[in-house]
Amino acid sequence: MKDTADITVLGAGSYGTALAISLASNGHKTLLWGHDPEHIATLSRERCNAAFLPGISFPDCLVMEADLGKALAASRNVLVVVPSHVFGDVLRQAKSLLRADARIVWATKGLEPETGRLLQDVARDALGDAFPLAVLSGPTFAKELAAGLPTAISVAGTDAGFTADLVELLHSPKRLRVYANDDFIGLQLGGAVKNVIAIGAGMSDGIGFGANARTALITRGLVELSRLGEALGAQQATFMGMAGLGDLVLTCTDNQSRNRRFGLALGKGCDVNTAQSEIGQVVEGYRNTKEVFTLAKRLGVEMPITEQIYAVLYQGKSPLDAAKELLAREKKSETAAAD
């Protein structure tokens, strides 16, 4: 089937729209699909996503499409940018509509709800093994990406040719640097765990602990990410790159991060429901915490920071008590195999 677009983006939220804008700004004809026809009609009419990215106009070669079948028929390259808790549902909905030569990449960050499985496993369950898969991950705030501010990300996949094509599609000398990576597992994991640690960093700052505590939490959070990655067969070098340290620092230190702002509200005394309402958008880290906690328990990986954040979100523990428990833990060597 002949392409009528270079790539189709599924998901018209802030990040999906930002990626679509970036792709179209490279001169690629890009189709942006969303599940709400009224929202897509508004985007098409106003030529911007005023709700999430106000003041940023769409390039001429960015086209809206409310019909999923038409969107998937337009291009073999499909970029999925939906929340992790609906990722599997969207792929199952898409399966019968995908072209035989389709190639699937996602920028969704998270794990499968309840089970803690990697999204590669969710994708294979939904689609089978016929399609090349890839993941896009790294330190990216949607507003900055959409505005064309310099950004760097990583991409990894099951097919080297697909990965190379994605680098060519996404890379822009003026706005976006894209690094190829061969660690498919590591890139998926980094995007989920950093959301959890960002909530913890926000809690710490909300309590008023300061920069020293925040930096310690980020550093030990990176240890937890590396430890979980090792158990899953990821490459440790990945966690020192864009999808590990890069994304972790970004989300833990800047208030553009919904996860960090959520943690800040909790640290200042808000309950979970109030804190989520204040954000006004999906806080991926809330679900990610349960998913990462579940995965770590299943694999027998010790992740004390994650455990305390889970206790705050799902067991009613106060952020201050969680912090006190972390500080009171038995003294250990920094370089010991388990902390």
Curated annotation (Swiss-Prot):
Active site positions, chain numbering: K194
Molecular function in Gene Ontology = glycerol-3-phosphate dehydrogenase [NAD(P)+] activity; NAD binding
Name the residues that bind NADPH. S14, Y15, H35, K109, A142, R258, V282, E284
Superkingdom of source: Bacteria
Looking up PROSITE patterns in the UniProt record yields: NAD_G3PDH
Q: Which residues bind sn-glycerol 3-phosphate?
A: K109, G138, T140, K194, D247, S257, R258, N259
* One Pfam family of this chain: NAD_Gly3P_dh_N
Pathway membership of this protein? Membrane lipid metabolism; glycerophospholipid metabolism
Where it sits in the cell: the answer is: Cytoplasm
**Reactions the enzyme catalyzes:** sn-glycerol 3-phosphate + NAD(+) = dihydroxyacetone phosphate + NADH + H(+); sn-glycerol 3-phosphate + NADP(+) = dihydroxyacetone phosphate + NADPH + H(+)
Q: Where are the transmembrane segments?
A: none
Which Enzyme Commission numbers does its entry carry? 1.1.1.94
Q: Which residues form a coiled coil?
A: none
Task: Provide a GO CC annotation, any one.
Answer: cytosol
Record-level GO BP terms: carbohydrate metabolic process; glycerol-3-phosphate biosynthetic process; glycerol-3-phosphate catabolic process; glycerophospholipid biosynthetic process
Query: Which keywords does the record carry?
Result: Cytoplasm, Lipid biosynthesis, Lipid metabolism, NAD, NADP, Nucleotide-binding, Oxidoreductase, Phospholipid biosynthesis, Phospholipid metabolism
InterPro entries reported in the protein's UniProt record: 6-PGluconate_DH-like_C_sf, 6PGD_dom2, G3P_DH_NAD-dep, G3P_DH_NAD-dep_C, G3P_DH_NAD-dep_N, NAD(P)-bd_dom_sf
The record's similarity note reads: Belongs to the NAD-dependent glycerol-3-phosphate dehydrogenase family.
What role does this protein play?
Answer: Catalyzes the reduction of the glycolytic intermediate dihydroxyacetone phosphate (DHAP) to sn-glycerol 3-phosphate (G3P), the key precursor for phospholipid synthesis.
Full protein name: Glycerol-3-phosphate dehydrogenase [NAD(P)+]
Q: Which organism is it from?
A: Shewanella amazonensis (strain ATCC BAA-1098 / SB2B)
Lineage, opening ranks: Bacteria, Pseudomonadati, Pseudomonadota, Gammaproteobacteria, Alteromonadales
